[in-house]
């Protein structure tokens, strides 16, 4: 593999930004879900979402998968501790809270239909 270089004004050659940049991260975020208390259990506990998706849009998708009506509550938690803000993107959540499992980063979330923490 050939490294891209550029010549500086002093005549030296240096690697370009493209050559020294980190490899791009995956364009999706892997989410592992776990139910808390009396919340329905999902058949598929792993989901892949776009990093630009918000928590609010994810909760809407999760409501459909769990057949939870709009008049019933659905709570989402990180680290069994706190609920992320609905306008937070999965890129931000992944960057701050993902755990590395077998060379993959996974965002672990818990969901409940009754308040569980805080």
From Swiss-Prot:
The main place the protein resides is: membrane
Q: Which UniProt keywords apply?
A: Autophagy, Isopeptide bond, Membrane, Ubl conjugation pathway
Give the bilayer topology: Peripheral membrane protein
The motif LIR: which residues?
A: 90-93
Segments carrying the region annotation (Disordered) are: 1-30
- Sites marked Required for interaction with lgg-2: 87
What happens when the protein's gene is inactivated?
RNAi-mediated knockdown causes no visible phenotype, but animals have a reduced lifespan. Accumulation of pgl-1-positive P granules in somatic cells. Reduced lgg-1-positive autophagosomes in seam cells. Delayed removal of paternal mitochondria in fertilized eggs. RNAi-mediated knockdown reduces autophagic degradation of membrane pore-forming toxin Cry5B.
Mutation effect (residue 91 to K): Abolishes the interaction with lgg-2
Q: Does the keyword Membrane apply?
A: yes
Q: Where is it located? A: Preautophagosomal structure membrane
Q: Which Pfam families match?
A: APG12
Write out the biased-composition intervals (Low complexity). 1-23
Q: Which GO terms describe its molecular function?
A: protein tag activity
Q: Which GO terms describe its cellular component?
A: Atg12-Atg5-Atg16 complex; autophagosome membrane; cytoplasm; cytosol; phagophore assembly site membrane; transferase complex
Q: Where is this cross-link: Glycyl lysine isopeptide (Gly-Lys) (interchain with K-129 in atg-5)?
A: 118
**Record keywords: Membrane included?**
yes
Q: Which biological processes are named by the entry's GO terms? A: autophagosome assembly; autophagosome maturation; autophagy; autophagy of mitochondrion; cellular response to toxic substance; determination of adult lifespan; glycophagy; macroautophagy
Q: Which InterPro entries match?
A: Atg12, Ubiquitin-like_domsf
Q: Which cysteines are joined by disulfide bonds?
A: none
- Entry text on domains: The LIR motif (LC3-interacting region) is required for its interaction with lgg-2.
Assembly mode: Most likely a component of a complex at least containing atg-5, lgg-3/ATG12, atg-16.1 and/or atg-16.2. Interacts with atg-5. Interacts (via the LIR motif) with lgg-2; the interaction is direct.
Q: Which function does this protein serve?
A: Ubiquitin-like protein involved in autophagy vesicles formation. Conjugation with atg-5 through a ubiquitin-like conjugating system involving also atg-7 as an E1-like activating enzyme and atg-10 as an E2-like conjugating enzyme, is essential for its function. Most likely a component of an atg-5-lgg-3-atg-16 complex that promotes autophagosome formation by associating with lgg-2, but not lgg-1, at the preautophagosomal membrane. Probably, as part of an atg-5-lgg-3-atg-16 complex, required for lgg-1 lipidation; the complex acts as an E3-like enzyme promoting atg-3-mediated lgg-1 lipidation.
Q: Which family does it belong to?
A: Belongs to the ATG12 family.
Q: Indicate what this protein is called per its UniProt record.
A: Ubiquitin-like protein atg-12
Question: What organism does this protein naturally occur in?
Answer: Caenorhabditis elegans
């Amino acid at each position: 593999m050939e490294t891209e270089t550029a010549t500086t004004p002093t005549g030296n050659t240096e690697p370009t930004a493209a050559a020294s940049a980190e490899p791009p991260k995956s364009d999706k975020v892997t989410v592992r879900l776990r139910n808390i208390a009396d919340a329905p259990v999902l058949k598929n506990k792993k989901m892949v979402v776009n990093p630009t998706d918000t928590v609010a849009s994810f909760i809407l998708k999760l409501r459909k998968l769990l057949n939870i009506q709009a008049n019933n509550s659905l709570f989402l938690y990180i680290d069994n501790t706190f609920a992320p803000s609905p306008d937070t993107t999965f890129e931000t959540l992944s960057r701050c809270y993902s755990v590395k499992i077998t060379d993959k980063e996974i965002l672990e979330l818990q969901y409940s239909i009754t308040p569980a923490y805080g």
